[in-house]
Every structure is written in C-alpha cells, then in structure tokens.
Amino acid sequence: MAKKGVREKIRLVSSAGTGHFYTTDKNKRNMPGKFEIKKFDPVVRQHVMYKEAKIK
C-alpha cells in the first residue's frame, strides 16, 4: 500500500466574516506555518484576506 502524502487539506476562511471559504491543500513540509492569501470574496464582492483553518 502507498504511503500517506505530505499534503494536508485545509480550508481558507474569509476574514470579512461572511462565512465564505475555499478548500485547498498545502505541503506541510514546505509551509509549516499558517497560510494566508488574498482572494476574492463573492459575498462582499471584494478581495479580502483568507486565513487557514482545519477542515472539520
């Protein structure tokens, strides 16, 4: 059986407080810290910061 990969699924939650989120994965070995990126939030129709959260 194949080994489990180093990529972990994460959820990017909008900092605008709209509840909108994106899902993606990241390499835990290359990026051990929390992931932050500016993306488009369709609820407020603006680019806002999205922060990493665990997928429940």
Swiss-Prot record:
GO cellular component, one term: cytosolic large ribosomal subunit
Membrane-spanning parts: none
Covalent S-S links between cysteines: none
Keywords, alphabetical: Ribonucleoprotein, Ribosomal protein
InterPro entries found in the cross-reference section: Ribosomal_bL33, Ribosomal_bL33_CS, Ribosomal_bL33_sf, Ribosomal_zn-bd
KW Ribosomal protein (keyword) present: yes
GO-annotated molecular function: structural constituent of ribosome
Record family assignment: Belongs to the bacterial ribosomal protein bL33 family.
Protein name: Large ribosomal subunit protein bL33
Source organism of this protein record: Vibrio campbellii (strain ATCC BAA-1116)
Lineage: Bacteria, Pseudomonadati, Pseudomonadota, Gammaproteobacteria, Vibrionales
Gene of this entry: rpmG
